[in-house]
């Protein structure tokens, strides 16, 4: 990213920038298509206020939760909105009270901030900051939006946010308390890699590295090997886990996991009748006691139960990283498993704190083996600087709709949306 272009769109006399963005008009309900709700439009992005940053976005990557947002299952559920929370960009301008950033810095904006002074931050045991938690209000902290558009009646209407940032736009505004710089530590990291670091890679890698605290010689089970699960495999391999057991139904992704360090793979749809995934995992462990760490990244509630059942009760930690669709937003675990030592913890962005841990993750991302794993997740071709599944916002709505449909392809691990040249 050292040689990225630094030209910016010219604001109008009020400091407003007009650019292209991907708008979600309404939730994609059963029977509806992406064309019914998703479209590329021109929007207006107001100047940053207070401690905000206005950012020229380079690219965004599509998380499974972004698809759930389109379908109306994930908070905040207000529409119309700009979707997306994974992405990387360059600071174009800053609010008057912003500190520790400058125009031209390359940043990502993970879901959680880090004040470094609340009891949670000082504990070192969590990234759930009490002052800068996940913003699910769909607006800036002051209750307003920096995004607007002109509707078909010529009226100005506001656009809501996704988790305080919204990355599916050529320019966004974000509270600087939720941003962290890439350029000082990893200036050569390609933008798509920076994008997945902001959520998917941090979530999977951090679940193994920080939450489960896997040690050399441990056994690890990973349920679901999309981009988060593959990142967990990379971490387990790097931390010298002895057994890395992956569970999924997608043979392409299981094969990728094996190529990146998994020692055993289990296709959950090809198990003998009556055998559950957790039983299959336990059978692979010494004395069939289970694994030292169990990571759930599929987002399916049944796998969350299975992940806990696969772990050594009383010793192992089961880390839940995936968000899915559950009846009344509730997940039911077997009480007996809890009573006899089941240890389940929720995870957002891998327990990675944006100031205390993210710099270390950036350094890891530059190590050849880990960088090669990120290349695999993205299907990245260094010669062309393109990803296997990539669409440019400037190609228009039809190309975007086609790309969103392709997210369900068996060999699609991560879709990248290019927003500006790099």
Curated annotation (Swiss-Prot):
Cofactor note from UniProt? Answer: Binds 2 Zn(2+) ions per subunit.
Q: What is its EC number?
A: 4.1.2.46
Q: Which superkingdom heads the taxonomic lineage of this protein's source?
A: Eukaryota
GO cellular component labels: cytosol
Q: What class of enzyme is it?
A: lyase
GO terms for biological process, alphabetical: formaldehyde catabolic process
Q: Which GO terms describe its molecular function?
A: aliphatic (R)-hydroxynitrile lyase activity; S-(hydroxymethyl)glutathione dehydrogenase [NAD(P)+] activity; zinc ion binding
Cofactor requirement: Zn(2+)
Reaction equations catalysed: (2R)-2-hydroxy-2-methylbutanenitrile = butan-2-one + hydrogen cyanide
Q: What is the effect of changing residue 65 to A?
A: Loss of activity
Keyword Metal-binding in the entry? The reply is: yes
Phenotype for residue 104 to A: 90% reduction of activity
Q: Which family does it belong to?
A: Belongs to the zinc-containing alcohol dehydrogenase family.
Alphabetized PANTHER family for the sequence: ALCOHOL DEHYDROGENASE, ALCOHOL DEHYDROGENASE-RELATED
**What does the UniProt function comment say about this protein?**
Involved in the catabolism of cyanogenic glycosides. Naturally occurring substrates are the aliphatic acetone cyanohydrin and butan-2-one cyanohydrin, which are the aglycones of the cyanogenic glycosides linamarin, lotaustralin, linustatin and neolinustatin. Can use various aliphatic ketones and aldehydes as substrates, but not aromatic ketones.
Query: What's this protein's name?
Result: Aliphatic (R)-hydroxynitrile lyase
């Amino acid at each position: 990213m050292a040689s990225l272009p630094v030209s910016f769109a010219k604001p109008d006399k009020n400091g407003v920038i007009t650019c292209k963005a991907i708008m979600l008009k309404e939730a994609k309900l059963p029977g509806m298509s992406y064309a019914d709700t998703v479209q590329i439009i021109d929007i207006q992005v107001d100047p940053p206020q207070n401690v905000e940053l206005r950012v020229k976005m380079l690219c965004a990557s599509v998380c499974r939760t972004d698809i759930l947002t389109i379908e109306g299952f994930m908070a905040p559920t207000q529409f119309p909105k700009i979707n997306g929370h994974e992405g990387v960009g360059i600071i174009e301008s800053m609010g008057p009270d912003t500190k520790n950033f400058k125009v031209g810095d390359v940043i990502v904006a993970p879901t959680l901030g880090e004040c470094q002074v609340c009891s949670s931050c000082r504990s070192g045991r969590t990234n759930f900051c009490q002052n800068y938690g996940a913003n699910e209000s769909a607006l800036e902290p002051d209750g307003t939006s920096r995004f607007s558009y002109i509707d078909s009646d010529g009226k100005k209407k506001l656009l809501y946010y996704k988790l305080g940032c919204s990355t599916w736009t050529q320019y966004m505004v974000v509270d600087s308390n939720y941003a962290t710089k890439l350029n000082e530590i990893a200036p050569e990291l390609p933008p798509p890699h920076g994008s997945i670091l902001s959520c998917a890679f941090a979530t999977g890698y951090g679940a193994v590295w920080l939450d489960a605290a896997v040690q050399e010689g441990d056994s690890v089970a990973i349920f679901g090997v999309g981009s988060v699960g593959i990142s967990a495999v990379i971490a387990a391999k790097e931390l010298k886990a002895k057994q890395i057991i992956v569970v999924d139904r997608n043979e392409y992704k299981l094969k990728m996991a094996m190529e990146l360090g998994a020692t055993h793979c289990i296709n959950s749809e090809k198990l003998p009748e009556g055998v559950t995934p957790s039983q299959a995992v336990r059978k692979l462990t010494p004395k069939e006691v289970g694994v030292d760490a169990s990571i759930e990244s599929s987002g399916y509630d049944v796998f969350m139960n299975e992940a806990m059942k696969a772990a050594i009760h009383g010793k192992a930690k089961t880390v839940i990283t995936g968000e899915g669709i559950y009846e009344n937003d509730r997940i039911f675990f077997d009480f007996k498993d809890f009573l006899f030592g089941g240890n389940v913890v929720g995870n957002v962005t891998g327990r990675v704190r944006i100031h205390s841990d993210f710099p270390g993750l950036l350094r890891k991302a530059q190590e050849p083996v880990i960088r090669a794993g990120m290349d695999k997740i993205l299907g990245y071709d260094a010669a062309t600087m393109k990803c296997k599944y990539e669409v440019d916002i400037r190609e228009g709505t039809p190309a975007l709709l086609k790309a969103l449909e392709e997210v369900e392809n068996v060999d699609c691990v991560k879709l990248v949306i290019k927003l500006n040249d790099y």
